[in-house]
């Protein structure tokens, strides 16, 4: 029944987005929403500091006129996912409601006190160095650490080969260390660890209706075969499956459908972060939007190791 409801909502929102005018005036500080121009600026900032993320165009027929043709959405590929959400230690005491006043019961940070980055942890890691400026440590160095760490095995987007959209780019993680790690685990008898290793391609698009970024993800198993919807749901916090996270068509790419983190609460969560920073005497620039965005959506997909921005300083 929930799938039917989500499908109906999805179709209605497609129409609503089509009819919604493009936001021209910045309302970031007041409401947490951003214009397409601000989305591009935040995307440029993310790509500069974390080059595993890259801009992409997608299908020519799906290009949005309100975004630059070469900057339709952001993508990072072959992101490792070593275990399922059910394998994480969990109890009700670790749960925190981020948004209380919505009809769906709030944005739930399931691993609020476990060290997994969520909305509260994101704010805690913000250090206000002055009232007039915000500084960001060189995140690119953190991104480069992936070349030294053992990650998950690589995966290709085989579904897109015939469309001509599959190409090698800088957004693809270096997976040589991933393979070496898997081999080492095999020699040590860790076969289960290999079978559990998955990889994901993640995308960030601009949602014209909600006027916020939107996260999309599509996964592959250790044999580089696309995961089923049920398998992808295993890597998503069960508090968000079929609620915050639904299966929908990517606005810039051909099928298959992907998991998408619904953006209906993004602006309100961002507004709370802006207020928290302001209470500490600082000011959150709109260029930081996607770095913060990647922090609070990790509460939804805590086992996917995409977040290389967790140690930035403000």
UniProtKB/Swiss-Prot annotation:
Q: Where is the active site?
A: 264
Renumbered to this chain, motif Caspase cleavage motif LETD spans: 166-169
- List residues of cross-link (Glycyl lysine isopeptide (Lys-Gly) (interchain with G-Cter in ATG12)): 243
Q: Where is this region: Disordered?
A: 143-167
* Residue window of motif LIR motif: 104-110
Sequence motif Membrane-curvature-sensing motif, residues:
4-19
Which residues get modified to N-acetylmethionine? 1
Q: Which residues form a coiled coil?
A: none
- GO MF, one annotated term: enzyme binding
Query: What's written under domain?
Result: The membrane-curvature-sensing motif targets curved membranes. The N-terminal region works in concert with its geometry-selective amphipathic helix (AH) to promote LC3-PE conjugation activity only on the target membrane.
- Name the family the entry cites: Belongs to the ATG3 family.
Identify the PANTHER family for this entry: UBIQUITIN-LIKE-CONJUGATING ENZYME ATG3 (PTHR12866:SF2)
The name under which this protein is listed is: Ubiquitin-like-conjugating enzyme ATG3
What lineage is on file? Eukaryota, Metazoa, Chordata, Craniata, Vertebrata
Q: Which gene encodes it?
A: ATG3
